[in-house]
Each structure stands twice: as structure tokens, then as C-alpha cells.
């Protein structure tokens, strides 16, 4: 039996730790919070459908069925393309639709989809957020 390498209340999934935070912050402040809470953390990047499902289930369990806002992830639009704040490559996506609103340049897991689809929100919106770091 190996010890859980993640902070108490965090999800341990395939070598990474995920922490859900209910406080609603604009995207940049949420990213800053992730960096402070534990070294090496960022807003979460999501690279596979398995990782996405695990994160969505974790958020749903944390929320215990409460209605809430979308949840920031570490994806943002810069220089005409989407990038992960942790510098990882984008190989997977789960956009709700491809009709991006003008000026909405940060991505969130959509509450109404059970967090299984992404939508673009104005980065100034205040949302809950999920951080990710290596275990």
C-alpha cells in the first residue's frame, strides 16, 4: 500500500494531484492561487478522456450535487491559439461547440454538462477552479 502523495482532499490520478477550490476567482487570480497552494501547481491541464472523466467525477463529488458555476482549467487563448498554462501540448479537447464568443479567452469545465465539456468564458469571470501538480 503506497501513501497518498497528494494533499488531503485532493484527487490522486496517474501521478498527478488535483485540488478543487470553491472560491470564485477570475482566471489569472485562480492560476496565481494554484501556484501558491503548492509548488509546481497550475490550473489543471487535461490531456485524455480518462483524465477528464476522473476530474469531472472528482468535482461532482466535491460539489455534492450543489448547483454552481463553471470551473476554470488552465487553458487560455493567446496569439490566435489555445495553450495550456503549464506549457504542455494540447492533444485533447472537449469543446461544447466551436462557436467561440469574441473576447472570451479562457476555458472552463461547464457545470451544466457535469463538467464533461469545455466552454470559453471571459477571463474576468469569477469561477471555481481546479489545480493540478505532479504527485
From Swiss-Prot:
A family per Pfam: Lectin_C
Keyword Secreted assigned: yes
GO MF annotations, alphabetized: carbohydrate binding
Keywords: Disulfide bond, Extracellular matrix, Lectin, Secreted
Chief site of localization: secreted
GO cellular component: extracellular region
Subcellular location, record wording: Secreted, Extracellular space, Extracellular matrix
Disulfide bonds: 6-17, 34-131, 106-123
Annotated ranges, domain C-type lectin: 13-132
Disulfide bond found in the keyword field: yes
Cited CDD domains: CLECT_REG-1_like (cd03594)
Protein name per Swiss-Prot or TrEMBL: Rheacalcin-1
